[in-house]
């Protein structure tokens, strides 16, 4: 029994340590990626894009006879849950604006669509920044994603609304027969599950990189839970505060801005959570090696795949044991320096002849040996640190030796690796 207790204490201590370290990394990444500033920027963009998005939604509903009138009902339902205390006033304002927008000319409609597109583009850029992706979607893939959000999104939301309405009607009809309150529980769980699914799709589909669905789903559930908690707390504060006493009818404006900012903060926090979770899950001993070793391991894989006429996916590199975020950072670097190229399917192929590329080029790309920027500091540091000049000389010698040692081509390096493996194979 005592041994069991000790084992449990050790395990709980280890779990607490992991959770503490994870929380520290989560808050660090949230601040490092400037998520709070991004939330403020997206709040500002939302003010301009919300009416265009609603206009597109109404247009989609009007084009489908089965959903006739659903737009207004859906609008009321969303804002009832969206902002408990001021949702009715905000909903009325936005509905009026959207009704006026539907009477715009062709040029006005184009401007509304451009505004909605820019918001979606800004959201993708923010998510790419969180995942360390520098290259946004371009061409057909980006257009299809945004069009899917603007066209299919409202239909899915309408389907969710109809499902919720159906469950509510079933709950009312079976109220006397449902002694255990099962339908009431289902009616409460389904909207939360749909919210979780929406966040999951947002985390998985928006970034221009492969996000494991498992971690996206976990992040979606956690984010939906945080959303419900913050919504309840916000509603309680609004209901028991003196905002309306101070601002009067104008109180809806600061409250709406505050809520939108909180909403984007929760969403971006969820995206950072998914990224941090994925990095922790894929982390291994190899991911703690230097950038240069990781690049060489990846280039060796690209060489093998190129010999077979195949491309390399994100999953292929992650399976090597490299951290997901570490790989994405090195991938962006290799694409930027044209070591690899992106295919139309989103995979990657080798774009350089490894017989004409040497190890030193890789070392220079990842800034592995020494930094030439230190030489520019000679005058500033030498006066305060007499040893700095001697250090620069030794550093220069190290660089020359490293450059000479790394002059071998990458093809020779990888070919030598296979030659060393052959005797071992013959012996077996």
Swiss-Prot record:
Question: Chief localization class?
Answer: membrane
Pfam families for the chain: Virul_fac_BrkB
Q: Name one GO cellular component term.
A: plasma membrane
Q: Which UniProt keywords apply?
A: Cell inner membrane, Cell membrane, Membrane, Transmembrane, Transmembrane helix
The domain of life is: Bacteria
Task: Report how it sits in the membrane.
Answer: Multi-pass membrane protein
Which subcellular locations apply to this protein? Cell inner membrane
Where are its TM segments located? 47-67, 104-124, 143-163, 189-209, 218-238, 248-268, 292-312
The record's similarity note reads: Belongs to the UPF0761 family.
Q: What PANTHER family does the record point to?
A: INNER MEMBRANE PROTEIN YHJD (PTHR30213), UPF0761 MEMBRANE PROTEIN YIHY (PTHR30213:SF0)
> This chain belongs to which protein, by name?
UPF0761 membrane protein TERTU_3006
Q: List the source organism.
A: Teredinibacter turnerae (strain ATCC 39867 / T7901)
